[in-house]
Amino acid sequence: MMLLLPFLLGLLGPGSYLFISGDCQEVATVMVKFQVTEEVPSGTVIGKLSQELRVEERRGKAGDAFQILQLPQALPVQMNSEDGLLSTSSRLDREKLCRQEDPCLVSFDVLATGASALIHVEIQVLDINDHQPQFPKDEQELEISESASLHTRIPLDRALDQDTGPNSLYSYSLSPSEHFALDVIVGPDETKHAELVVVKELDRELHSYFDLVLTAYDNGNPPKSGISVVKVNVLDSNDNSPVFAESSLALEIPEDTVPGTLLINLTATDPDQGPNGEVEFFFGKHVSPEVMNTFGIDAKTGQIILRQALDYEKNPAYEVDVQARDLGPNSIPGHCKVLIKVLDVNDNAPSILITWASQTSLVSEDLPRDSFIALVSANDLDSGNNGLVHCWLNQELGHFRLKRTNGNTYMLLTNATLDREQWPIYTLTVFAQDQGPQPLSAEKELQIQVSDVNDNAPVFEKSRYEVSTWENNPPSLHLITLKAHDADLGSNGKVSYRIKDSPVSHLVIIDFETGEVTAQRSLDYEQMAGFEFQVIAEDRGQPQLASSISVWVSLLDANDNAPEVIQPVLSEGKATLSVLVNASTGHLLLPIENPSGMDPAGTGIPPKATHSPWSFLLLTIVARDADSGANGELFYSIQSGNDAHLFFLSPSLGQLFINVTNASSLIGSQWDLGIVVEDQGSPSLQTQVSLKVVFVTSVDHLRDSAHEPGVLSTPALALICLAVLLAIFGLLLALFVSICRTERKDNRAYNCREAESSYRHQPKRPQKHIQKADIHLVPVLRAHENETDEVRPSHKDTSKETLMEAGWDSCLQAPFHLTPTLYRTLRNQGNQGELAESQEVLQDTFNFLFNHPRQRNASRENLNLPESPPAVRQPLLRPLKVPGSPIARATGDQDKEEAPQSPPASSATLRRQRNFNGKVSPRGESGPHQILRSLVRLSVAAFAERNPVEEPAGDSPPVQQISQLLSLLHQGQFQPKPNHRGNKYLAKPGGSSRGTIPDTEGLVGLKPSGQAEPDLEEGPPSPEEDLSVKRLLEEELSSLLDPNTGLALDKLSPPDPAWMARLSLPLTTNYRDNLSSPDATTSEEPRTFQTFGKTVGPGPELSPTGTRLASTFVSEMSSLLEMLLGQHTVPVEAASAALRRLSVCGRTLSLDLATSGASASEAQGRKKAAESRLGCGRNL
């Protein structure tokens, strides 16, 4: 109910309010107010209670959602019990319902069963201006003497208006007159009446009468009025008229005043003498008949007496007009208004009205506390304290209480839970008493019947049942009958029985109606000595209630089990016991079955002292009997085979002894003993055992046991299993470690700057501090087609002979600077030891450097290096052609006709295979010839790094192309693009198409990092493209070193930026192997890279001074082009400075050539001095 409180507070309309007592938790008292205007037609809707409370309408359901508990008889209102719709049943007349009461409120109570609330409905009937003011008579006649003085007042009849508020009587008005005026007087009770006032002297001779119109009007919209004609007759002069001591009086009398009681004595005086001074009293002409019947006046004395009983409830006030006149002629009466108020007295006893919530006095016993039972209304017709009623209950148990809701209305609530089984009928007495000085009371007796609910579970007669029975009972044996009682009525009190499911519930069964328990099967004491099950008793009410009880069944043991021998172990009722005998002494040893030296019975006592000093314990027979008590007590005896009384068997313990001190004579003999084990039951059961006792010596025993197969013990088996598991675990661990330590080789091109930066930010690797001054990134010379390993030996001999014939063999012996690429080439070509050991190796290295094919990056493939260097291949050297030239078109057409050939799958390098159908270089061509062509190719690669301002002529010889490159550098028109990719050279994306420059097919196109390398078709060079090395050296050497060499700019063709030299050998995963110290000097000692300390082997021997020109030229040109391809972007001024250094280096070369007759050390010293001053060599 506490949950209903906020619901009701939030759902009531603005005209409603809720109050609820703190001790009432089941029924809320709600007050709902409605307003309706009077005179509405029948059937007009006043309000809907379901909308006010927002409860669901119970259409089509049993019972009513709303019920009127008390309705005034005069109120024409009806209610729909389903949704609480209030409407008028007939015409509403506020004046009839409330008379002059304002506001007009009528109330009644409604019980909302859906919301568990008592609704106090209060309907305010609003007044409309449906009545006009009315005078008692339409015409009133007055008499006045012509000698009346000014300001004489004559009371006029008061008009009545049944409406209230603004619609009631508002004021009066008088038609215009020069002799009379109107004065409106407001009485103590807010009533208004008019008085006629003389404002001008009267003259009967001029005006004998006056006709005036008195109008009374209200303040309604529109206002209504009523008129009365006042006729004033002017009489001859009578000097004086009677005058009352007070013109108006108010009198209060109790309503219980006895008729005939004098209420007031009025007095009036007239100063005249004789008849003109005698005064008589009478009621005015316009006094109502009700007043005339209720009151009377004595004409002589002026006493007003009560003629009949008063009733405050009918008329609480009376207004009386009393007049007094003398007995003279033309008498003028005097007027006096007397207001008589009736005082209410406690003359009405309270009346008690009971309205049941369920239309009957039958209540359910499962009602919770503070449940609503009935509405008690105490009515008292008296007013004030006389009408205030207090009610209370007179009861024995205190299960009910009354709670005031509003006024004299109470709710009858439950004060405790009800119990039909103890009190099926409750008798209550309701007392009501008002609050008057002499209180009046009333009483009413109530009888409340309690209906039964299923609130009692069945109860067994005992809290636990126990029963005993013999085992091996027949099925359907009666065990016990259970009985449970239920105090409820009808089906709520009918009890049924069942057994709760359990492991033993299948052993018994119970009758559903009677509760008789029987056994379903034969019971066995040896399986269970007793069992317990639960019986559930349930009634048939809703909801169903149940109770349970435990029943213990004890089984009595019967001797139904024979003894069972456990030791010795029997085989078909037989057992064998071997006893060891010392053949020399005849002493008995332990039985074979008991090698531990302890008592066979397990007592821990040595066998010697068990029975007697001369006896020996052979065996303890262990038997058991599943029966209990005497049925399980066992007796042991030897039945047969002991005729010589050699053995003794303990009857109670089952210990078998032998009575002998020297058993030498028993060796080899055997005894068959018949042993009987018998219980003490009735009848007794027994078991027979055949025991064979054999006496043997220790030698015989050992001989027999040698033939028995060996059996591994449990600890040995455990150790073997543990060893196997550890071995398996070790193998798995070794396999796991070997897999985890497998290195993933990444032989991609290395960038020292990026590697150093990324290496520092890897927290799982140690920091490798690399000094930038100690390392220098050099370009790698690359070759072309794949060569097989099988042609390598023939190439060695051929290249050497060709080199000697051309006069260049001395060049290979000259000391020159090895680039890291050349050094790795020498190191990786088959474990060669010394450079001076074989000049052919160096020559083969150069050939391999420029002719080795480029393959796919093997960082994610299996890297299988060739066991021997591939065969020599003539490097591809093609002059640049102008786009559209005949040579370019012929070559392009030839390339289109040739189909590419796939390289051998067995070749493994860091670059992927290229499809190239090239020709093998002629044997007559020397190594320097190939080196020069490679340098030309590197120069064109440098042009591919930019959009050239000036382009070298495509038909110029190779050395002239290098000269043109240097001239562009000198003029500041070429700035090499910086390279940050180590041994890879970036090129401008979007190279020329094959149709434009077809002679660049033999070179590798560059690609951005992370992109796939495009496959380019490669074609063989044309014969006319081969150049003579001698002609190159004779005609163009001077122009190579001359900074003022002119360029044929008009013949330049755009280079193809999509190619560069191929990598000659695969790179290693160790970045140290891809770097070199550029400042390392040549020495005859074994050479070592200063940065990483890797020993290569002995260097080449110094060549004669006359042959150093070609070696120096190759070294300086290699250093120059390394700088061009690997340096960062420099301004034009830096390029000019580099060219000036190159000129000095050229003069250094000339100096070396001029001083060929000097010693090698002197020439080398002068050269290094010049280089150190201007930064020649690798510092260029």
Swiss-Prot record:
One of its GO terms (biological process) is homophilic cell adhesion via plasma membrane adhesion molecules. Residues 904-918, 1076-1093 have a biased composition (Polar residues). Glycans are attached at residues 265, 415, 582, 659, 662. Residues 857-930, 973-1026, 1076-1104, 1156-1180 are annotated as: Disordered. The keyword Membrane applies. Residues 1014-1026 have a biased composition (Acidic residues). PROSITE patterns: CADHERIN_1, CADHERIN_2. Residues 1-17 form the signal peptide. Keywords: Calcium, Cell adhesion, Cell junction, Cell membrane, Glycoprotein, Membrane, Phosphoprotein, Repeat, Secreted, Signal, Transmembrane, Transmembrane helix. Residues 18-716 are extracellular. GO terms for cellular component: cell-cell junction; extracellular region; plasma membrane. The modification Phosphoserine is found at residues 859, 1064. N-glycosylated. SUPFAM superfamilies: Cadherin-like. Gene3D superfamilies: Cadherins. Residues 28-135, 136-244, 245-352, 355-460, 461-565, 600-711 form the Cadherin domain. CDD domains: Cadherin_repeat (cd11304). The keyword Calcium applies. PANTHER family: CADHERIN-87A, PROTOCADHERIN-12. This is Protocadherin-12. The lineage of its organism: Eukaryota, Metazoa, Chordata, Craniata, Vertebrata. The gene is Pcdh12.
